[in-house]
């Protein structure tokens, strides 16, 4: 293919326009402008993606991978460790390391985790963060969403328990703002989702433009139809447009 080539290595193919395989063994690079940098049996079909390691697959564009046996199908993603996956609808996500982990949302970072599929007595543990956003222009509460706007509930799978820290910051059109922190624990027992105890809500600081006393903006977490919703409540007495952003940090055990 035009502009493609291999430099060193063994039995590798560079088939995409401007693609390359450099000192790589048995790799196949068919994505345009993609490159395999050393490694073994790397398969790259995503445009402008790159990777190292062995037996990794990258179908997402503008992505990078390392480690072994990983699959990166989300665009603008990053995947490392061993046998980890970034899903196709999870753009802008990353797995920093660990074993047998899979992303759940777009804009998610799995910092580390470990899933032992051979011994059911070994706990699955993971530490992850998902980034959040919302825009409000009225006085009604609204559900915050993932950064790509596609998901508005954050529920552990059956058999899992999450210890959660939620940070949300709001900024009004007049550049006034506020910030909140919420800590809570949620479990899923055979489809029945429960928040254990009461979420701890701390208003870290809040400008009066976001309301005062009973009219002040706030954040709530609750279970509706066995799904966890995070609601941002704008100022109640008058509509003030606001941008809301934050992240949900999860420590997960199953």
Task: Map each language-model feature to its residues.
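Surface-exposed ligand/attachment interfaces on beta-rich extracellular proteins
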Residues: 117-162, 169-178, 190-241, 254
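Short, low-complexity, polar/charged sequence segments that are solvent-exposed and flexible
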Residues: 186, 250-254
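Short beta-strand elements
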Residues: 181-188
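Periodic small-residue-enriched repeat registers in elongated scaffold domains
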Residues: 1-145, 149-154, 246-250
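Intrinsic disorder/low-complexity signal
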Residues: 1, 25-27, 164, 182, ...
């Amino acid at each position: 293919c035009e502009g493609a080539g291999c430099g060193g290595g063994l039995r590798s193919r560079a088939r995409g326009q401007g693609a390359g395989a450099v000192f790589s063994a048995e790799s196949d690079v068919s994505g345009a402008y993609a490159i395999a940098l050393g490694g073994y049996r790397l398969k790259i079909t995503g445009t402008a993606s790159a990777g190292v390691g062995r037996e990794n697959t990258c179908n997402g564009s503008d992505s990078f991978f390392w480690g072994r046996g990983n699959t990166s199908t989300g665009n603008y993603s990053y995947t490392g460790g061993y046998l980890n996956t970034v899903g196709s609808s999870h753009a802008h996500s990353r797995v920093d390391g660990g074993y047998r982990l899979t992303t759940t949302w777009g804009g998610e970072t799995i910092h580390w985790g470990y899933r032992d599929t051979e011994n059911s007595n070994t706990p699955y543990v993971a530490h992850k963060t998902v980034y959040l956003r919302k825009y409000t222009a009225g006085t009604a509460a609204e559900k915050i969403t993932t950064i790509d706007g596609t998901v508005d509930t954050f529920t552990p799978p059956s058999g899992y328990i999450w210890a959660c820290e939620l940070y949300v910051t709001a900024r009004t059109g007049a550049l006034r703002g506020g910030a909140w922190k919420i800590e809570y624990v949620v479990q899923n027992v055979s489809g029945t989702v429960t928040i254990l105890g009461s979420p701890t809500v701390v208003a870290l600081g809040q400008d009066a433009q976001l309301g005062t006393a009973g009219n002040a903006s706030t954040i709530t977490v609750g279970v509706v139809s066995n799904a966890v919703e995070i609601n941002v409540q704008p100022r109640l007495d008058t509509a003030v447009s606001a941008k809301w952003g934050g992240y949900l940090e999860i420590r997960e055990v199953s």
